A protein has these predicted regions:
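Noncatalytic, beta-rich nucleic-acid-contacting surfaces in large DNA/RNA-processing enzymes
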Residues: 1-207
Length: 207
């Protein structure tokens, strides 16, 4: 279940860069490294990779002393690519902001170089990242559709083709998929055909 959720969250333009590292860590936990000890409880479940928006929020809270509210504001700024806000927050993340009650990484024993490296990774990651609940919701849909395709392949493919009627790019791809699955595509029949794709069960399933 967690693999499905992580797979969906990783397959995005920002987190996608972490896929090789994630797979290597999953297959060989000894290869997983962390830039500082404070990251271990946050990133251990995802093999040292930032996968979810919630992890960004936890990183800035645990490493730099952000409040819950401020960590969410940073998450929003990153996702909306607000460059001025992100650069201002970099200063707070690395060096702290006494007036606003942010300790900063350096006071927590994290070097300036490592703090900036972590912040750069968070910016690259957060541009198109999902929160975990969002990825989980998509995961449920993926699980359900995989079940339907496996156990009710003809019905599933008929419904899929109906959703792409008139789409000259997608429909041929799904017709090829029917052939790969061993499902016949029948020609129109004035005595049997309907307005849309339907399933005909005879000696073998056909659409």
């Amino acid at each position: 279940r967690q693999d499905i959720i992580a797979g969906i969250a990783l397959y995005r333009p920002g987190p996608m860069d972490f896929i090789p590292k994630y797979l290597e860590g999953k297959n060989n936990r000894d290869s997983v490294t962390y830039d500082c000890p404070q990251l271990i409880p946050i990133l251990e479940p995802t093999y040292g990779c930032i996968v979810y928006q919630e992890q960004v929020m936890q990183i800035v809270r645990d490493l730099a002393g952000y409040s819950l509210g401020r960590s969410d504001l940073l998450r929003r700024a990153m996702s909306k690519k607000k460059q001025a806000v992100m650069e201002k927050e970099r200063q707070s993340f690395v060096y702290g902001n006494r007036e606003e009650g942010v300790k900063g990484c350096i006071k927590n024993g994290i070097s300036e170089e490592i703090a900036n490296k972590i912040y750069d990774e968070m910016i690259d990651f957060a541009k198109y990242a999902f929160n975990k609940s969002h990825a989980a919701a998509y995961g449920v849909v993926a699980y359900q559709t995989a079940y339907l395709k496996y156990y009710y392949a003809a019905e599933f493919m008929a419904a899929t083709l109906n959703s792409y009627l008139g789409n000259l790019d997608k429909a041929p791809q799904y017709i090829d998929e029917c052939k790969r699955l061993g499902i016949q595509i029948l020609k129109p029949d004035i005595n049997k055909s309907f307005e849309k794709f339907t399933v005909e069960v005879n000696k073998s399933e056909a659409v």
